[in-house]
Amino acid sequence: MSEIVWRAEPLAIAASNIQDFTNTLGAKDYDDLLAKAAADPDWFWDQTIRYMGFVFEKPYDRVRDLSKGAAWTTWCLGGTTNATLSLLDKHRDTPTYDKDAVRFEAEDGTVRVWTYEELDHQTCRLAAALTELGLGPDDKVGIYMPMVPEVVAAFFATARIGAVAVPLFSGFGHEAIATRLNDAGATAVITIDGTQRRGRLIPMKPVMDQALTNVPSVRHQIVLRSHDVALAWDDNRDHDWAGIVAGKPNFVPAVIVDAEHPLLLVYTSGTTGKPKGTILTHVGFTVKIGFDLLVCMDLKPDDRMMWISDFGWVVGPMITTVCCLAGATMVLVEGTPDYPEPDRMWRLCEEHKVSFLGVAPTTIRGLMQAGTDDVEKWDLGGLHVVASTGEPWTDEAWKWCFEHVCRRRAPLFNWTGGTEIGGGILVSTFMHPLKPCCFGGAVPGMEADILDDAGQPVATGEVGELVLRAPSIGLTRGLWRDPERYMETYWSQYPDIWRHGDWASRDADGLWYVHGRSDDTLKIGGKRTGPAEIEGLVMATGLITEAAAIGLPDPRAGQSVMCVCIPSPGVAADENTANQVRDAVAAGLGHAFRPKDVLFVSDLPKTRNMKIMRRVVKAAAQGQSSGDLTALVNPKAVDEVARAAGQVWLISPCAETNSMGSYQRKVILVDGALDAAILPD
């Protein structure tokens, strides 16, 4: 079992938001807080809403209604509000109104700063323009923009008029955009001419124009001009941002809506079929995301948060919402963390005085390849918290980040949940010690547990399904236009219990761990493990940059392990490397999990938030349909995996095999370059 590597100092615990919240609710400690929340959820969420300072126009009569079942819980009955009352209006006539709300750095180094006053004015002017176009609470507004200051105004203006924002990944092609806009029934979109990425201007309005040829419901397209480029223009549909906001007032009142009115319609990838539309409400999303980051992870008004992401993933709306709820400053960045210099991310931290840094394990693994010189030369002493979400860590990457980014001083807080949760299920706080890759505990108010297939809690150290025994205020209100899919996906395995689809465990110290998606689990000869454990062992060899471990049908063991690997720079994709990969897994997990197949590729299929899509890898390796691929940033990687894996099925085994019937296959070169190699054992 790993050793504890960090504990907060007593003074830091005493000064933390989680300690203040615990004291306010009269709990003795974190475990007592969990127990009180489970014993009286209505009391807990009522206290949480009050503590967060969420503003209602009309107070609610009841905290929640479960009369239709846990899956269809409604919240804050009778209450009316608008999220922007808590994000903008409450800061007027306070010192916060004059402080920085948004700091932005473009890829070329240009910096722009908006105060809360400027953000408020920009939001209200655009809201007035949208209202003049006839948009209001019945409308869905697609937002297809990079993380520039105006994306915050676009989101808040949409919310202010009561319309529903539909975030769209800035790297989507026209088909993915059209699919989501049609499903949402969008009537307007807000976009930009283009954005810089790795030294190139990436067009965005032309992509949206092409998408809109297949979306007849969209009547209006608002376009932000940020570059001197010629644009095709439809006078009946297109509106120049600067033109429509000119002369509009700096203040317009928020349209008051029901507390349960949708704020966001966020699409996530579906395993099969169309993407899933999650419905996040004004009260639900704002309170839940605020509780997780302000209370649990200690975001404070004087923090500057940087979390390099995209508005099309829920982290984008999260950053904008939680920073303004706290009165903190968001640091937005155009482009990638390693361009134009490999140390760009660390320079941004020092120069913008970032104190709350969000990272993804994939990003850290990529930056690790440059060594430690790039990170060590920058002053990261201002970091108060480093937070992580998106996927499980490998032990090596977590330790590297804790050592070289956190400097063993700032905590590395793990946080897991998802778009459908509207926040997290597991989190770390200043009250919890840290071990590599751990979560401190469950988020209060959700009754997280770990169950076996029969619905019984698993023993300490055992792996099971991560579930919620109680609905949370942040949960999606179903799936857009698909209630049957919602019930089947999340509520069908255990009665009135949310099954999240992740494998999790708890150790003897009460710390939690996530082992990957439960539908990615490998079961070899009756023994079960998550792919993250195998992948961690593979990457710990130093030979492999990234890996995806999948299970393939095997007549003897039920499943056999295939590792699809990206070799580290300078490492040969040959039998020697493949055998070292096999040996590392066997040494760590036992011979039963020794990979039968090792496949080398140049890229792995990833989503917009850089998660490796194992289900896509598995489908490609078996020549099956990969389902919805619109969220992939690199769909060509699917073809590469399929092409390489096809060598197993299309080429007969060598005549000479060992007693187990296994065989070796040589590296395959395509057009004189390494394409892929499948090396069965």
PLM feature segments, named:
Residues 18-19, 23-25, 87-115, 225-233:
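AMP-dependent adenylate-forming
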Residues 33-36, 84, 98, 102-156, ...:
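Conserved AMP-binding/adenylate-forming core of the ANL superfamily
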Residues 98-100, 221-223, 234-267, 274, ...:
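Conserved pre-ATP/AMP-binding loop-to-beta segment of ANL
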Residues 160-243, 360:
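Structural core segment of the AMP-binding/adenylate-forming
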Residues 168-194, 208, 350, 357, ...:
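AMP-binding/adenylate-forming catalytic core of the ANL superfamily
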Residues 286-304, 314-355, 370:
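Conserved AMP-binding/adenylation subdomain of ANL enzymes
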Residues 325-328, 354-359, 368-434, 447:
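Gly/Ser/Thr-rich phosphate-binding loop
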Residues 441-445, 456-490, 529:
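Conserved ATP/PPi-binding loop(s) of AMP-dependent carboxylate-activating enzymes
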